[in-house]
UniProtKB/Swiss-Prot annotation:
It comes from the Bacteria. Belongs to the aerobic coproporphyrinogen-III oxidase family. It comes from Caulobacter sp. (strain K31). Pathway: Porphyrin-containing compound metabolism; protoporphyrin-IX biosynthesis; protoporphyrinogen-IX from coproporphyrinogen-III (O2 route): step 1/1. The keyword Cytoplasm applies. Its main location: cytoplasm. It holds the Pfam family Coprogen_oxidas. This is Oxygen-dependent coproporphyrinogen-III oxidase.
Amino acid sequence: MTDTSDLDGKKATARAWFESLRDQICAEFERLEDEAPTDLYAGEPGRFVRKPWDREAGGGGVMSMMHGRLFEKVGVHVSTVFGTFTPEMAKNMPGADEDPRFFATGISLIAHMRSPRVPAVHMNTRFIATTKSWFGGGGDLTPLLGYQRQQDFPDAIDFHAAYQRACDAHDPTWHAKYKAWCDEYFFLPHRNEPRGIGGIFYDHHDSGDWAKDFAFTQDVGRAFLEIYPTLVRRRMGETWSAEEREQQLVQRGRYVEFNLLYDRGTMFGLKTGGNVESILSSMPPEVKWP
């Protein structure tokens, strides 16, 4: 059952955390830009450019985009929006059938790397309130080369372990459940293949203890901040071939297909009057369909 006490305070607390996490991630990614070896990554280290936007129906957000030498394209976005769901949206949102007003705040990130040896990554966490409230989010890794897309590859093992630690700190049953949900969610039925090697995915997370649920969502964000830079540092010094770059560009096509056909966040943003530039910034900067 949703704890509705001091809902305004909870909204502000969640929003402040997502903005703080954004700042931490952007700072770490800029450090990685500085550390990238110059013999593999020419040019000046990239820096994030922030662009605020307003939603006509209520709220807005800030896009943080970087086109760097290591990070070919990365967006780390925060948004806080509120208003009234359309009847179609209200039918699918817990608590909105009683009252269609809503509030949503969160962070969303997608990184496409220049090196095909460094996996792409997606992470988002969010807090949504109607007459009920809940958290959702997760993180998933998308290696672009076939040999890295195996569950026994070291990067996959370490990525899953990071999220297992985050889950186990709160409930030892959560990781298996949210890992399976991630595998089910990030799957392309028309290709009959997963988008990547998975991670965790959760939604409508409401135990009735807001502080506990918020702490878990914070730990999901911290787990990402711990593991992904570790994997980038592990792989960014490896050289790559033209054939591997080609494989990367083709595999990126799967990313585009998933985000435009199936992704809940994309659909939610477009159907609630979100910022189109921000929503579609998840698209890779270069992609091929052979």
